[in-house]
Amino acid sequence: VSTIGRFKKSNPETSMDSIKVPLRVIQLAEAPVNFGTEVTRANNRQNKIENRDFVSQDPEQIRIQSELRMEGIDYSIMRSETFSASDTTFDVDEALVSLACASGNCSIVTQVKGGVGKIYENLEGGYYKTLFNPNVTGVYVNCVVKLNRKIEKIRNAETSKLGSYSGKDYGTLVHGNRMIALLVMSGLKAKDVFAKGETFSFPDEEVEKVFSQSLLRLKETLAENYSDNTLGSLFKNSTKCNAVYNKIMATV
């Protein structure tokens, strides 16, 4: 159906009156629990299907989407080629990354750095349910996304100040993007602040201050303990990242 829609949009003068679309209706009245979801999974094979595509069927995602809509936020839970983020729009991937960085759980953040696809592999448990569960409100999701965007803006500005796109400083800012966000949010105690259930935004000056402190501590810790490590690999290593995170947080 989406293909037909795209064709019509590109060829508005073409008549679609004679098009036939095969349709199958399955009665679920006496079907087992979750049978409809399983049928959907088994039959969606006409295009490349990823676990991420079934997030839109998660009741928690639908609830969060509804709560965000009441806040004037468009939360996209379906994968779309035309999606574009804005001040009032974000998708489930951005929400997942932001929630991970706010979680205080370095193992989750390391997995996100390695690839969010692994988290979508188990939509019934694991890290996915740690991030998206009945206790996570739409307001909370919106707050962590906005804070993560602030952190990213500062990080991008710091990266642009560097005279070279190489070296330890550059590698730390680029490869350590998720670790930096985790450290900043932990330093701000964002999870506890946002968990109060109210819309809150940290002042830019406070975020910038904690960012600078976190980046400095991260550089010092890496220089002291992992000077010979390749940063691209280090920030995907859960054991090393947990050691770095715990060492830094012990000084905060």
Give the residues covered by each predicted segment.
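Short active-site loop/helix that positions an aromatic residue
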Residues: 2-17
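A generic structural motif
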Residues: 15-29, 52-56, 205-209, 213
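C-terminal catalytic or substrate-handling cores of phosphate/nucleotide-
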Residues: 25-193
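C-terminal accessory/interaction regions of large nucleic acid-associated machines
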Residues: 175-252
